[in-house]
């Protein structure tokens, strides 16, 4: 199956706009679950406002949030897919620029030193593009995640040592959620990366934060720790928008990697309540959009 750059460009454009407008079904279901279980009156009111915002965005074909975020594209290439990797990256950038200028969208991307905004949602190394491979035949998947600054500004890394054990990981994650408070626009998805090197650990935390609700860590011990941490975080009383309540997080997600015998890095990356993402899947039958 051959994929032309123009197809990727159009998908990149469409995905950015879709991600900013339509919340995935698993996040909507997460809101319904929290709204049903929340016992604090103020928190329940805040959740109601968030749910109403989702409805208004859908009914009026508007954005879910004013923050268009840092555009992240995760590309997964299956077997028997023919494409030009360099051309694909350029096509994604063009699609991102077109979405920003044609819609138009607010560009949130600036030069890190001069703070100059090119009004394209693009810049040095942005959009962020990750490319990986899968065993699926004749399939190309492109996931788009617009990562907002409230959640991204509250990212943490600790180079723990093995002697501190799992309890140190739990304490660190809980402390990070407390430190973030309402700045991440909770309820959040708390992504936790454990193991690897510092850079891999942070990447794992981001991957965990953008996983669909209801998914579990593939490792049985990791999945058990997810459940314990989710319970611990939701006992903190941070609540929606940091105003108190039971609903601090939709879930805690964990991704693991093997690490050095003298290391045990742990990273936290959170996703705000507007946990936006969109996906395009190319097959011989065409392109299908979803989440």
Sequence positions of predicted segments:
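Non-transmembrane, aqueous-exposed alpha-helical and coiled segments at domain scale
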Residues: 1-192, 197-291
């Amino acid at each position: 199956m051959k994929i032309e750059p123009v197809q990727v460009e159009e998908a990149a454009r469409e995905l950015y706009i879709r991600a900013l407008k339509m919340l995935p079904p698993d996040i909507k279901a997460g809101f319904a679950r929290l709204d049903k279980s929340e016992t604090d009156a103020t928190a329940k009111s805040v959740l109601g406002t968030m749910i109403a915002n989702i409805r208004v965005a859908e009914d009026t074909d508007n954005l879910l949030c004013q923050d268009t975020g840092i555009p992240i594209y995760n590309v997964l290439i299956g077997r028997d897919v023919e494409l030009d990797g360099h051309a694909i990256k350029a096509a994604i950038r063009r699609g991102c620029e077109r979405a920003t200028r044609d819609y138009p969208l607010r560009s949130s991307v600036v030069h890190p030193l001069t703070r100059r905004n090119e009004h394209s949602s693009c810049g040095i190394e942005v959009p962020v593009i990750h490319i990986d491979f899968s065993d699926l035949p004749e399939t190309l998947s492109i996931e788009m995640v617009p990562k907002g600054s409230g959640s991204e500004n509250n990212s943490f890394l600790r180079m723990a040592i093995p002697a501190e054990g799992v309890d140190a990981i739990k304490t660190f994650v809980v402390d990070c959620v407390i430190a973030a408070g309402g700045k991440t626009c909770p309820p959040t998805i708390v992504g936790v990366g454990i193991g690897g090197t510092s850079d891999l650990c942070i990447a794992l935390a981001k991957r965990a934060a953008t996983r669909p609700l209801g998914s579990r860590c593939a490792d049985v011990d990791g999945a058990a720790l997810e459940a314990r941490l989710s319970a611990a975080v939701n006992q903190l009383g941070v609540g929606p928008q940091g105003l108190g309540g039971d609903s601090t997080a939709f879930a805690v997600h964990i991704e693991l990697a093997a690490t050095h015998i003298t290391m045990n890095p742990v990273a936290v990356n959170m996703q705000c309540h507007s946990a936006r993402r969109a996906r395009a899947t190319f097959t011989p039958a065409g392109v299908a959009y979803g989440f």
